[in-house]
Amino acid sequence: MSNTTGFTPLLTQSRVDGDSLVFNVSEDWTQGRTAFGGLQAAMALTAMRKLVPAHIPLRVLQVTFIGPVLVGDVTVQARVLRTGKSVTHAEARLISGGETGCLVVGVFGSERESSLKVDNTVYPELPSAESLKNMPLFPGITPRFLEHCALRWARGTPPFSGASEAHTGIYIRLDEPVSSEAHMVALCDIIPTPALSMLKRPAPASSLTWTLELLRNDYNETSAEPGWWLMDAEVTRGEGGYLSQTALLWDAQRRPVALSRQTVTVFA
């Protein structure tokens, strides 16, 4: 990958402008004409983390993708909405070309004592990542940001293959280990909507809203090389150009790590 910017350098090389952070988004982190949604959320989280203590874990991100976040300087304005006994709410806005392109609310919560413990998740038994091949990249069709990722289909088929169902199980990884909340946020937005697999020819799709719930905070990879994570995703309802989908992310120890819910618009 020549002339590309790593995920960590892109976030850490931001500059301060008054009460805002300014990030420089490069072409290799785009999907279509806008920045990769996972990167947008990660930039918002980075700005919120300047205001929220690191010892309070991120629990939920609520993201609304409003308009294009263009290549070049992106200004992120963050503020704390409220700090309670256990939970802090913060907000971040991404400004691109003078317009708000993305609005993010972060919910950070300290652990509290509880007698309840519920886990109804079931790990999907699928072929191993090592037995599968990476999805090839097609310039002009696959989003540029996928240069920084790898995807291997264990269930379902890649986009535009005429699949019979909108349900996929995809092993995913970034090109650097998941070592922070920001990495985790970006990782959870890598996959395409499973609905695209049902189409027989390319068509654009775009996330409209995204809610990401982190189910644990002991997920950081400690190895020097990135590992594989499994994202099990399914469209539960789609009509009139709008899709509702849910995805569950599993780590290499088969532990559920994150729950992702999105409303996606598709132009087909």
Language model region names:
Residues 1-268:
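Terminal targeting signals and extreme-terminal segments of soluble enzymes
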